[in-house]
């Protein structure tokens, strides 16, 4: 095998030596391509696995943790929630519409593969500077393309997109982030797993035909960008949501039978990863007859068939003798269904082309025992340069308030979420635009499932460990503010180039933060994804661990809003304000800096707040609640009253006026009627949570907070209309 071919497959000299040892000979091109894909960062997690192994993954309510297509938790009365968040960053930067659309398609398949009907989607989007003349036009093109791709796929599938977050920063100029989350629901006893066992059991290919789109996608997503990346468009998959809708319905029909042993979606690395993962998990072997693969392009080679990432395809291990029944279901839905292989006990993947053996590869070294790297790490030099920076006011409070509320990181994103169908399936209780976590009703048990997606890249830049822990806490707090109990998380870890020791240190610290927070807050990790090499021309993104917290409220009718719908409601701030300005939005807007330091998270205070919110809501003491986040109580209150029908007369009580922009954790704003104040304050005292009365909601159409005063019309214009103008 010549060195240029090996290099083109991103195989290092050390890895090639391992390949020779595993095979006992030189690989052919097909085998090299298969091994390259399975050992890519995207499929093998070779740089990250050693840090992920310490995550807490168990709890009495966890049915399935990491290692399957998606995580599963018990949501009561025999029902389960199946969910996962995943990235499609590199493809979305190259081809925003197709990249984002197929990102949604992939995460939907991960969930319905487990036997669940998908009932909700979320997304976390990060773009570059939309004001800089050099890149704003391209960034706006990316925003519009990505949003269009997400809405197109989700809407066509009939899956409501009910929430998300969108942020902008210069660090994403060369690498945008597109993280998609999906949640499905099924009976706890009806979960299907990705396994291929039982010698002689048939392996069936179902779904759309295979083309050349997406070739090398897993390898492409395991490398950084440079000027040559513009030629990578052919590696972006092309999605067809209508085919996926048929595939989902066919699979859900199949799941009502007892015809199959296991099922796996064909995602990154296509037929390669699905076959190796199914056999690897089961400790079995497999024969694949590649010439039987349904194709839509002529002249496709075994190499292309194994590595194509054409969308809307699944691999099924059926029970012997039930092949025709399985095929009949998929034919009914006008989908291809062909037996292309069988399970063996050899522990090897045997690839045939017109009855000729063209590839023979041991499965375990590519799946369960793929190489794990221990890359060098070192603390970034910039941390010592930024840690002592202190924020001081230079602008007036009113001026800062206005600048912040109309900033693209805070203002309303109706331009984005209005393109998503949030009410299809008629389960949505709380959707995008209503602040905080989103929530859906589970008709089978009357419960509400709340979910929130969170990632503050600036905080992770300032302190990767505490920043990651804060993401776990913040996502959980948003869920708690709906009245639900946070139960588990899914994570999508977006970082720069792992070959840079400073980036690897950031990643290791981020994992420590997640591990610590999940353990202390009792919200285990049940699924996730790692996206590395988010780097262009040597510049990495800020560390960006995206966390989705999922929780359950037993009675969906008790789901809390984040808006004040009545006048004369008492407005309270819960939790302590500690003067946290490191990595804050107010610093970024006033000083154009991301600097400072972060305080350690007080987990006892966080848990106490969650417990108080749950109990107060159970006792029907609260009218509304919202987590305090970016921009401090000033922005939290401004947004709550912007989406409300009433005005506000509020006084913070802070001696230092800048404290209204403090971003301390473990805080929430709640609204309650005056007759419930005494009972609520007694409960807060019982849980050890400080409660500060800020004022009341009023019938007058104005917003007043300390020296800040705006008419309701001015407030609404700043919040609701700014982004539409910025994105045009």
From Swiss-Prot:
Q: Where does substrate bind?
A: 87-90, 109, 237, 309-311, 531
Q: Does the keyword ATP-binding apply?
A: yes
| Record has Protein transport as a keyword | no
Entry annotation: catalytic residues: 42, 88
Q: Which GO terms describe its cellular component?
A: cytoplasm
Q: Pathway, according to UniProt?
A: Purine metabolism; IMP biosynthesis via de novo pathway; 5-amino-1-(5-phospho-D-ribosyl)imidazole from N(2)-formyl-N(1)-(5-phospho-D-ribosyl)glycinamide: step 1/2
Q: Which reaction does it catalyse?
A: N(2)-formyl-N(1)-(5-phospho-beta-D-ribosyl)glycinamide + L-glutamine + ATP + H2O = 2-formamido-N(1)-(5-O-phospho-beta-D-ribosyl)acetamidine + L-glutamate + ADP + phosphate + H(+)
Which positions does UniProt annotate for Mg(2+) 1 binding? 86, 529
- What's the superkingdom here? Bacteria
Which residues are involved in binding ATP? 45, 84, 491, 528
Enumerate the GO terms in the molecular function aspect.
ATP binding; magnesium ion binding; phosphoribosylformylglycinamidine synthase activity
Which GO annotations describe the biological process of this protein?
'de novo' IMP biosynthetic process
Q: Which InterPro entries match?
A: PRibForGlyAmidine_synth_PurL, PurL_linker, PurM-like_C_dom, PurM-like_C_sf, PurM-like_N, PurM-like_N_sf
The entry's function note states: Part of the phosphoribosylformylglycinamidine synthase complex involved in the purines biosynthetic pathway. Catalyzes the ATP-dependent conversion of formylglycinamide ribonucleotide (FGAR) and glutamine to yield formylglycinamidine ribonucleotide (FGAM) and glutamate. The FGAM synthase complex is composed of three subunits. PurQ produces an ammonia molecule by converting glutamine to glutamate. PurL transfers the ammonia molecule to FGAR to form FGAM in an ATP-dependent manner.
Q: What PANTHER family does its record include?
A: PHOSPHORIBOSYLFORMYLGLYCINAMIDINE SYNTHASE SUBUNIT PURL
Question: What is the name listed in the Swiss-Prot or TrEMBL entry for this protein?
Answer: Phosphoribosylformylglycinamidine synthase subunit PurL
Species source reads Campylobacter jejuni (strain RM1221)
The protein's gene is named purL
């Amino acid at each position: 095998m010549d060195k240029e071919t090996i290099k083109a497959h991103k195989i290092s000299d050390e890895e090639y030596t391992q390949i020779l040892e595993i095979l006992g000979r030189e690989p052919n091109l097909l085998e090299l391509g298969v091994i390259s894909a399975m050992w890519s960062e995207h499929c093998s997690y070779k740089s990250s696995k050693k840090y992920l192994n310490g995550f807490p993954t168990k709890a009495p309510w966890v049915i399935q943790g990491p290692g399957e297509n998606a995580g599963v938790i018990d949501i009561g009365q025999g029902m389960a929630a199946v969910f996962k968040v995943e990235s499609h960053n590199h493809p979305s930067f190259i081809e925003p519409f197709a990249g984002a659309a197929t990102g949604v398609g992939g995460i939907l398949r991960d969930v319905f593969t487990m036997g669940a009907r998908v009932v909700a989607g979320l997304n976390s989007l990060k773009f570059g500077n939309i004001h800089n003349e050099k890149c704003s036009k391209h960034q706006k093109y990316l925003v519009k393309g990505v949003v269009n791709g997400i809405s197109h796929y989700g809407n066509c599938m009939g899956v409501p997109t009910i929430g998300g977050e969108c942020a902008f920063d210069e660090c994403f100029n060369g690498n945008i982030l597109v993280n998609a989350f999906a949640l499905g629901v099924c009976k706890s006893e009806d979960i299907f797993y990705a396994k291929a066992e039982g010698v002689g059991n048939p392996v069936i290919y179902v779904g759309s035909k295979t083309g050349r789109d997406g070739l090398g996608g897993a390898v492409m997503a395991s490398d950084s960008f440079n000027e040559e990346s513009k030629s990578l468009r052919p590696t972006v998959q092309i999605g067809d949501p209508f085919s996926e809708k048929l595939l989902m319905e066919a699979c859900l029909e199949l799941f009502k039978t007892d015809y199959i042993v296991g099922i796996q979606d064909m995602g990154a690395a296509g037929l390669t990863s699905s076959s190796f993962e199914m056999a690897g998990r089961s400790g079995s072997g497999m024969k694949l007859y590649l010439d039987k693969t349904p194709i839509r392009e002529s002249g496709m080679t075994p190499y292309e068939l194994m590595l194509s990432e054409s969308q809307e395809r699944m691999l099924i291990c059926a029970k012997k003798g039930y092949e025709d029944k399985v095929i009949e279901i998929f034919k009914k839905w006008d989908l291809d269904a062909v037996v292309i292989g069988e399970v063996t006990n050899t522990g090897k993947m045997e690839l045939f082309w017109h009855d000729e053996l063209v590839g023979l590869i041991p499965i375990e070294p590519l799946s369960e025992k793929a190489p794990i790297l221990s890359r060098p790490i070192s603390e970034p030099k910039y941390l010592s340069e930024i840690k002592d920076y202190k924020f001081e006011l230079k602008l007036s409070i009113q001026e800062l308030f206005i600048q912040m509320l109309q900033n693209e990181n805070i203002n309303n994103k109706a331009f984005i979420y209005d393109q998503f169908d949030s009410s299809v399936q008629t389960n949505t209780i709380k959707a995008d635009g209503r602040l905080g976590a989103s929530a859906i009703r589970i008709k089978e048990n009357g419960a509400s499932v709340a979910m929130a997606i969170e990632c503050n890249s600036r905080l992770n830049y300032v302190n990767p460990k505490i920043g990651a822990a804060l993401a776990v806490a913040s996502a959980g707090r948003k869920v708690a503010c709906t009245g639900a109990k946070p139960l588990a998380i899914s994570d999508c870890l977006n970082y720069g180039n792992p070959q840079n020791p400073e980036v690897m240190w950031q990643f290791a610290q981020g994992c420590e933060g997640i591990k610590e927070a999940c353990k202390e807050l009792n919200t285990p990790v049940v699924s996730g994804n790692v996206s590395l090499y988010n780097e262009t021309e040597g510049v990495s993104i800020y560390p960006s661990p995206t966390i989705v917290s999922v929780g359950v409220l037993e009675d969906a009718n008790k789901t809390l809003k984040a808006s004040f719908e009545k006048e004369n409601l008492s407005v309270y701030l819960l939790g302590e304000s500690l003067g946290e300005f490191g990595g804050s939005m107010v610093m970024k807007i006033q000083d154009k800096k991301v600097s400072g330091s972060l305080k350690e998270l007080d987990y006892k205070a966080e848990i106490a707040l969650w417990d108080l919110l749950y109990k107060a809501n159970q006792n029907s003491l609260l009218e509304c609640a919202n987590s305090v986040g970016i921009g401090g109580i000033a922005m939290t209150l401004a947004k709550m009253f912007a989406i409300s029908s009433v005005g506000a007369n509020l006084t913070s009580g802070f001696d230092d006026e800048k404290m209204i922009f403090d971003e301390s954790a473990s805080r929430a704003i709640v609204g309650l009627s005056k007759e419930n104040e005494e009972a609520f304050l007694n409960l807060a005292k019982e849980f050890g949570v400080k409660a500060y009365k800020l004022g009341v909601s009023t019938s007058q159409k104005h917003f007043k907070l300390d020296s800040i005063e705006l008419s309701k019309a001015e407030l609404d214009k700043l919040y609701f209309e700014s982004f539409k103008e910025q994105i045009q």
